[in-house]
Amino acid sequence: FMTSEDLWFRPVDIKMGPDGALYILDFYNKVIGHYEVPLTHPGRDRNRGRIWRVFYTGKDGKQSPPPLPNFTAMSVEELIKNLGSKNQTMRIMAGNELVAREDGDATKSLLAAINKPADNFQQVHAMWALLRLNALPDQAIETIITNPAPFVRVHGIKMATSKPQLNEGLATLVQKALEDTDGRVQIAAVQGLAQHPSEANLKAILSFRTKVNQNDSHLYYASRLALREQVRNPEAWKGLPSQSSDPLALKALADVALGLPGASSAGFLANKLALIQPEGDREIAAVRMITRDGTDADKTYIVSYMKNAQRPKARQAE
């Protein structure tokens, strides 16, 4: 896309500007491999850098550069219109300006825009602006969580779960989103519920964790992390985990228990070890955790468990 005969040319970042031009950050330095050159080397340049502005000049090369928009001079109506721009930077900067003004008229216009949006972009960015102004109704979030467009549903879930408290209605919708047909929506729901530990969310995440496709490494890891966050509080182990008897659910809980040292998680492992039946290194890790963090009763049990006559002598020795 872009080359230079200048041997100091070091492009390190690229952004699209609100004017539609591309801005390329040029570190501009003689040194290429910084791990090879001492910090005190005189060839290191500490004073210069360049920003390249790249824009279309037309087939004849005579087209003028695009003008830079002045958001501070725009009316509320112009800013709201730009929330629907095809240029993401334009949308973001227009939203930032609306929030920075803290204008009551802007809030009213934003509320009107989300009720009759020109397009999905305008609706989403108007809602984020209202959320930042603490003026976004929960009903509006509920509406877009079920929007036909997956990217809109993702934003709705992120808005809902960014709140300090997730009310029951929104929580139910986010839980249902775990069954969405779009992977981006699912991972947004998983990551969002991770921020709101509760018995209902734990149940939803645990059920999802046992069904998620392990070949989807991102979603699989996100569900694992979310499950851990649901039981990070030691009190959480006294609820659903202690009552569960489903082998798949217990294995999923045991997986995260090993990453949460403490008496509660160790007690869970001791009580459910016979049902979980961990193998190899997982079993050794569970035994070590129980003997380290468990109660005296847990430790007594684990000794009898390991001495079971049906167990190989080599495994008992380990």
What are these language model-derived features?
Residues N233-K251:
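Short linear, low-complexity motifs centered on an aromatic residue
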